[in-house]
Amino acid sequence: MKNISKLSIVTILLVSSLTIMVGSVIAPALPSIVENLDFKFTPGLLVTLPSLGVVIFSPIIGRLINKLGPFQLLCWGLIPYAVLGFIGFYLKNNYLLIVDRLLLGAACVAIQVAITTFIAQLFEGKDRMKMIAWQGMAIELGGVLFLSIGGFLGELNWTFPFYIYLLAIPFLIMVLRSLPKANIKQNKSTYTNDDSDEKRFEKRIMKPVFMGSFFSMAIFFVAYVTLPAYLPKQFSFTESSTGYFMSAISLVAVLTASQMPNITQKLGEKITVCIGFLFFALGYLLFGVTLEIYIMYVGVVLTGIGFGLTVPLLNHLVVEYSGEMSRGKNLGRFSMMVFAGQFAATFVEYIPGNSFYIFICTAFISLLVAIFLYIFFKRNN
């Protein structure tokens, strides 16, 4: 680990938390927001459109990171993040609102790629693994706080959740004060891209990692798209109750991510990812078959474990198996697949039938992904 202050670490973790809230912070108050903005399209789009923005702009950001460096890219991401997120409730025109949410996704991917590049440059080996685990915890803890606060504020006034985006401004001040402005020279990475065999291995290992990234976030975000409408209808939840329920998933993910280094040391990284998808399958299976709220909370625990064992670990695999010159590009692709998964979750609303079919289909897909990844990793051990 390079010389880095505690304030720098705190800054990295706080800024990381912004990536989870880009769409989800308004989720608990989504019915009220859709009604007041007179949004004519599928309600879930307001949550997932930033994800589509990430997908569109990720290739550009992946190239910019090598030209601008993480510090400049991060600063240029935080400013529009605050502005575009905040002005959402002013935009009564549906098409302007759609453009705003798409551009918010561009700001988000700039933040994610820049902050992960900082981690790659400032930390090495076990320290890097630990920091990525902490980053996963920070992201999910942000989910806990922002969903809870978003639900609470949404009950007071439908516009209040949009004010949370302004947190990017004090975080920008912390970035200016604590993070290095110049690129940091790195020691030779595990994969340098100098050897053709290593290049081939990198390409081969990245394919399932990117696929796993897509499905892990798509599966996770099914809850964000379906639960805001399902819980009030089935269990008479208020907006704040919905926010607390959904934030519980993130809380479990935080606790799981905190143990990720210990778990991977015992089971191995690739097996741990497969197990994470099995937990997803069990969680959504319970969501689909039960009408009891306490069983729903068991599903919350299982789903949270699934997320905590997949997305942070897949992020680590991208950093670990990327050469220095290809890391920015691979992180851009990772962001693209993660947020493409978020956007894809929108389309579960078009599955025929009620929420039962959505949850069961999600559980089945989770199982298939776990099996596929296990077979691939076994063959390429």
Where are these regions (language model features)?
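Helix-to-loop junctions at the C-terminal end of transmembrane segments
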Residues: 58-69, 256-268, 353
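Conserved MFS/SLC helix-loop-helix module at the cytosolic interface between two early adjacent transmembrane helices
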Residues: 56-93
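A late C-terminal transmembrane helix in Major Facilitator Superfamily
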Residues: 319-356, 362
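Helix-loop-helix hairpin linking two adjacent transmembrane segments in secondary transporters
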Residues: 134-177
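Juxtamembrane intracellular "pre-TM" segments in multi-pass secondary transporters
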Residues: 2, 180-209
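Paired small-residue
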Residues: 95-103, 283, 294-302
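Central cavity-lining transmembrane alpha-helices of secondary-active solute carriers
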Residues: 48-62, 247-259
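Cytoplasmic helix-loop-helix junction between adjacent transmembrane helices
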Residues: 100-139
